Amino acid sequence: MSRKWVKIIAILIFILSGSYFVYNKLTKPNLGPKTTKLYKHGFLLLEEQIGTYIKEHYTGIEKIEFSPIYVTEEGSTFSNAYVSPTIYDKYGNKATLGDKIKKFIPLSYGLISDIVLDFDGGGNEVIELLDSNGKPVDVSNEEHLPKRAILTEASSTDENIELLVEDGQLIGVVKDDKGSPGAEIVYNTELHKGDARE
Protein backbone atom coordinates (compact mmCIF):
# COMPACT_ATOMS: atom_id res chain seq x y z
CA MET A 1 0.00 0.00 0.00
CA SER A 2 2.77 2.48 0.90
CA ARG A 3 4.69 1.77 -2.37
CA LYS A 4 1.59 2.76 -4.31
CA TRP A 5 1.49 6.14 -2.52
CA VAL A 6 5.20 6.72 -3.11
CA LYS A 7 4.67 6.13 -6.85
CA ILE A 8 1.66 8.47 -6.94
CA ILE A 9 3.57 11.21 -5.10
CA ALA A 10 6.60 10.75 -7.40
CA ILE A 11 4.37 11.06 -10.48
CA LEU A 12 2.70 14.19 -9.09
CA ILE A 13 6.09 15.79 -8.35
CA PHE A 14 7.25 14.94 -11.88
CA ILE A 15 4.11 16.46 -13.43
CA LEU A 16 4.34 19.61 -11.30
CA SER A 17 8.03 20.18 -12.04
CA GLY A 18 7.40 19.61 -15.76
CA SER A 19 4.50 22.07 -15.69
CA TYR A 20 6.68 24.66 -13.95
CA PHE A 21 9.40 24.21 -16.59
CA VAL A 22 6.93 24.56 -19.48
CA TYR A 23 5.28 27.62 -17.85
CA ASN A 24 8.66 29.36 -17.49
CA LYS A 25 9.66 28.45 -21.05
CA LEU A 26 6.44 29.97 -22.42
CA THR A 27 6.24 33.11 -20.25
CA LYS A 28 9.81 34.06 -19.24
CA PRO A 29 12.29 35.52 -21.73
CA ASN A 30 15.45 33.53 -22.37
CA LEU A 31 17.99 36.17 -21.30
CA GLY A 32 21.23 35.53 -19.47
CA PRO A 33 21.61 36.78 -15.88
CA LYS A 34 23.79 39.74 -16.88
CA THR A 35 21.34 40.87 -19.59
CA THR A 36 18.38 40.37 -17.23
CA LYS A 37 20.08 42.60 -14.64
CA LEU A 38 20.73 45.26 -17.33
CA TYR A 39 17.08 45.21 -18.49
CA LYS A 40 15.75 45.48 -14.93
CA HIS A 41 18.14 48.33 -14.02
CA GLY A 42 17.53 50.26 -17.25
CA PHE A 43 13.77 49.86 -17.27
CA LEU A 44 13.48 50.90 -13.61
CA LEU A 45 15.19 54.18 -14.54
CA LEU A 46 12.89 54.56 -17.58
CA GLU A 47 9.82 53.93 -15.40
CA GLU A 48 11.06 56.57 -12.94
CA GLN A 49 11.51 59.02 -15.82
CA ILE A 50 8.01 58.44 -17.26
CA GLY A 51 6.28 58.26 -13.86
CA THR A 52 7.99 61.42 -12.61
CA TYR A 53 7.02 63.35 -15.75
CA ILE A 54 3.35 62.36 -15.50
CA LYS A 55 3.20 62.97 -11.74
CA GLU A 56 4.84 66.41 -12.00
CA HIS A 57 2.94 67.67 -15.08
CA TYR A 58 -0.65 66.39 -14.66
CA THR A 59 -3.31 67.03 -12.02
CA GLY A 60 -6.12 64.60 -11.21
CA ILE A 61 -3.94 61.49 -10.99
CA GLU A 62 -4.31 59.00 -8.15
CA LYS A 63 -1.79 56.37 -9.24
CA ILE A 64 0.63 55.44 -12.04
CA GLU A 65 1.30 51.72 -12.32
CA PHE A 66 3.73 50.05 -14.73
CA SER A 67 3.25 46.78 -16.56
CA PRO A 68 5.92 44.10 -16.50
CA ILE A 69 8.73 44.53 -19.03
CA TYR A 70 7.49 42.76 -22.16
CA VAL A 71 10.31 41.20 -24.20
CA THR A 72 9.03 40.65 -27.73
CA GLU A 73 11.89 39.66 -30.03
CA GLU A 74 14.19 37.01 -28.64
CA GLY A 75 17.05 35.28 -30.35
CA SER A 76 19.65 38.00 -30.67
CA THR A 77 21.91 39.49 -28.00
CA PHE A 78 19.38 42.23 -27.26
CA SER A 79 15.65 41.80 -27.65
CA ASN A 80 12.99 44.42 -28.19
CA ALA A 81 11.27 45.30 -24.93
CA TYR A 82 8.76 47.83 -23.63
CA VAL A 83 6.63 48.82 -20.63
CA SER A 84 3.16 50.35 -20.45
CA PRO A 85 2.18 52.82 -17.73
CA THR A 86 -1.43 52.75 -16.54
CA ILE A 87 -2.87 55.97 -15.13
CA TYR A 88 -5.63 55.93 -12.51
CA ASP A 89 -7.66 59.13 -12.15
CA LYS A 90 -9.38 60.43 -9.00
CA TYR A 91 -12.73 59.01 -10.20
CA GLY A 92 -11.66 55.36 -10.29
CA ASN A 93 -11.02 55.21 -14.05
CA LYS A 94 -7.83 53.76 -15.48
CA ALA A 95 -6.22 53.88 -18.92
CA THR A 96 -2.99 52.45 -20.29
CA LEU A 97 -0.62 54.55 -22.35
CA GLY A 98 0.44 52.86 -25.58
CA ASP A 99 -2.89 51.03 -26.07
CA LYS A 100 -4.91 51.66 -29.23
CA ILE A 101 -7.40 54.54 -28.99
CA LYS A 102 -10.01 54.21 -31.72
CA LYS A 103 -7.79 54.01 -34.84
CA PHE A 104 -4.70 55.65 -33.31
CA ILE A 105 -1.89 53.49 -31.91
CA PRO A 106 0.43 55.55 -29.67
CA LEU A 107 4.12 54.81 -29.23
CA SER A 108 5.16 52.33 -26.57
CA TYR A 109 7.89 53.05 -24.01
CA GLY A 110 10.96 50.95 -24.51
CA LEU A 111 14.06 50.05 -26.43
CA ILE A 112 14.83 52.09 -29.51
CA SER A 113 12.36 54.93 -28.80
CA ASP A 114 13.18 55.80 -25.16
CA ILE A 115 16.17 53.87 -23.83
CA VAL A 116 19.46 52.40 -25.02
CA LEU A 117 20.77 49.28 -23.25
CA ASP A 118 24.16 47.76 -24.04
CA PHE A 119 27.48 46.60 -22.63
CA ASP A 120 30.75 48.45 -23.21
CA GLY A 121 34.02 46.76 -24.20
CA GLY A 122 34.72 45.93 -20.55
CA GLY A 123 31.34 44.25 -20.04
CA ASN A 124 29.93 47.17 -18.00
CA GLU A 125 26.31 48.26 -18.32
CA VAL A 126 25.54 51.12 -20.71
CA ILE A 127 22.15 52.74 -20.05
CA GLU A 128 21.08 55.91 -21.84
CA LEU A 129 17.73 57.65 -21.48
CA LEU A 130 16.58 60.37 -23.85
CA ASP A 131 16.09 63.87 -22.45
CA SER A 132 13.32 66.30 -23.46
CA ASN A 133 15.31 67.28 -26.57
CA GLY A 134 15.87 63.67 -27.66
CA LYS A 135 19.53 63.70 -26.66
CA PRO A 136 20.97 60.66 -24.82
CA VAL A 137 21.78 61.00 -21.11
CA ASP A 138 24.14 58.40 -19.62
CA VAL A 139 22.57 56.95 -16.46
CA SER A 140 24.60 53.71 -16.39
CA ASN A 141 25.88 54.17 -12.84
CA GLU A 142 22.69 55.62 -11.34
CA GLU A 143 20.44 53.75 -8.92
CA HIS A 144 17.68 56.37 -9.22
CA LEU A 145 16.78 58.89 -11.90
CA PRO A 146 19.24 61.82 -11.79
CA LYS A 147 18.00 65.40 -12.23
CA ARG A 148 19.70 65.70 -15.62
CA ALA A 149 17.41 62.93 -16.95
CA ILE A 150 14.11 64.37 -15.65
CA LEU A 151 11.81 65.28 -18.53
CA THR A 152 10.43 68.80 -18.86
CA GLU A 153 8.56 67.98 -22.09
CA ALA A 154 7.26 64.70 -23.51
CA SER A 155 5.05 65.41 -26.51
CA SER A 156 4.14 61.79 -27.32
CA THR A 157 3.07 61.20 -23.69
CA ASP A 158 1.09 64.47 -23.72
CA GLU A 159 -0.69 63.49 -26.96
CA ASN A 160 -1.48 60.02 -25.61
CA ILE A 161 -2.96 61.37 -22.35
CA GLU A 162 -4.92 64.03 -24.24
CA LEU A 163 -6.47 61.32 -26.46
CA LEU A 164 -7.36 59.20 -23.42
CA VAL A 165 -9.12 62.19 -21.82
CA GLU A 166 -10.94 63.06 -25.08
CA ASP A 167 -12.03 59.42 -25.38
CA GLY A 168 -13.49 59.53 -21.85
CA GLN A 169 -11.14 56.87 -20.46
CA LEU A 170 -9.73 59.39 -17.96
CA ILE A 171 -11.66 62.19 -16.23
CA GLY A 172 -10.22 65.32 -14.66
CA VAL A 173 -6.64 64.65 -15.78
CA VAL A 174 -5.25 68.00 -16.92
CA LYS A 175 -1.77 69.10 -17.95
CA ASP A 176 -0.68 71.49 -15.21
CA ASP A 177 2.69 72.11 -13.57
CA LYS A 178 1.02 71.77 -10.16
CA GLY A 179 1.12 68.06 -10.89
CA SER A 180 -0.27 65.36 -8.63
CA PRO A 181 2.20 65.34 -5.71
CA GLY A 182 0.19 62.72 -3.79
CA ALA A 183 0.05 60.27 -6.70
CA GLU A 184 1.51 56.83 -6.05
CA ILE A 185 3.95 55.34 -8.58
CA VAL A 186 4.14 51.54 -8.72
CA TYR A 187 7.23 50.26 -10.55
CA ASN A 188 7.49 46.78 -12.07
CA THR A 189 10.72 45.16 -13.29
CA GLU A 190 9.36 41.66 -13.80
CA LEU A 191 10.25 40.31 -17.26
CA HIS A 192 7.56 38.69 -19.44
CA LYS A 193 7.87 37.05 -22.82
CA GLY A 194 5.62 38.26 -25.63
CA ASP A 195 3.52 41.30 -26.41
CA ALA A 196 0.74 42.41 -24.06
CA ARG A 197 -1.06 44.11 -26.95
CA GLU A 198 -1.65 40.90 -28.90
Name each region found by the language model:
Residues 15, 32-39, 43, 154, ...:
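Intrinsic-disorder-associated interaction segments
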Residues 96:
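Beta-strand acidic-aromatic groove motif in beta-rich domains, primarily in extracellular
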Residues 20-91, 100-101:
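N-terminal export/targeting and maturation segments
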Residues 100-198:
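Extracytoplasmic electrostatic interaction patches
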Residues 1-15, 23-24:
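N-terminal Sec-pathway targeting helices
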Residues 9, 72-74, 193-195:
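Residues in flexible loops and secondary-structure boundaries
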